């Protein structure tokens, strides 16, 4: 499998997340310490506190996305490494509705990665996350987990719209969308009908589209387009 990723972009976002979270915490500390030594600044301490809290929360949110291990792209690459070079995976393409997309010989598979521990259920047509105290406390600085069925429908529609616009309707390609849970402590329970969601160890089986093989021209057009969005070549 061919892998496309702009490591400089990922590293830059990781550094910004760390700077924002550390900078916010330093401002919070300053809002407490400065008034102790400069009493005339006491009236401004709340400004530092609000700004610091906001920066810290934003920084922690993006640190969970860009710094937390295991990294989403590493997990996907490992799970799909047995695919041959007719499969191309693109991580974090710019101005694209999904962060990870797989071009296969038979279509496109968009992947929404969830890097959270916890228990998730799909029962009787309803999606539910078991909310623990720890998760509730971290909820504001962690990603939301949408219903995989709703996500899949919206993502497929958006990708079809984007591809039609980009290629003026000249390229038609089957599209599939999956929610992939990569955290080893995740519990995923699905009752009844299957849904477009899986844990990482089941991804290879799910990352397929039963369809005719794409013709060479649309396949190459899609490959070049996604490569340009991902690494800029």
Identify the role of each PLM range.
Residues 1-98, 103-109, 114-124, 129-233:
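Surface-exposed interaction regions that form or flank ligand-binding interfaces
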């Amino acid at each position: 499998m061919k892998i496309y990723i702009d490591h400089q972009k990922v590293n830059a976002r990781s550094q910004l997340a760390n700077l924002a979270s550390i900078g916010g915490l330093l401002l919070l500390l300053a809002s407490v310490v400065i008034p102790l030594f400069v009493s005339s600044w006491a009236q401004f301490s709340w400004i530092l506190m609000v700004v610091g809290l906001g920066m810290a929360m934003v920084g922690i949110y993006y640190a969970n996305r860009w710094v937390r291990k295991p990294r989403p792209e590493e997990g996907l690459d490992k799970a799909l490494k047995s695919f041959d070079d007719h499969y191309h995976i693109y991580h974090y393409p710019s101005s694209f509705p999904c962060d990870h997309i797989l071009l296969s010989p038979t279509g496109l598979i968009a992947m929404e990665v969830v890097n959270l521990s916890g228990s998730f259920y799909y029962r009787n047509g309803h999606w539910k996350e078991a909310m623990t105290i720890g998760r509730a406390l971290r909820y504001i600085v962690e990603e939301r987990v949408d219903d995989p069925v709703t996500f899949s429908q919206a993502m497929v529609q958006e990708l079809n719209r984007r591809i039609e616009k980009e290629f003026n309707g000249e390229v038609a390609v089957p599209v599939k969308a999956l929610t992939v849970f990569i955290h080893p402590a995740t519990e995923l329970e699905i009752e009844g009908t299957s849904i477009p969601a899986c844990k990482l160890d089941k991804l290879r089986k799910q990352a397929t589209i039963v369809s005719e093989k794409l013709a060479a021209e649309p396949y190459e057009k899609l490959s070049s387009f996604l490569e340009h969005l991902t690494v800029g070549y």
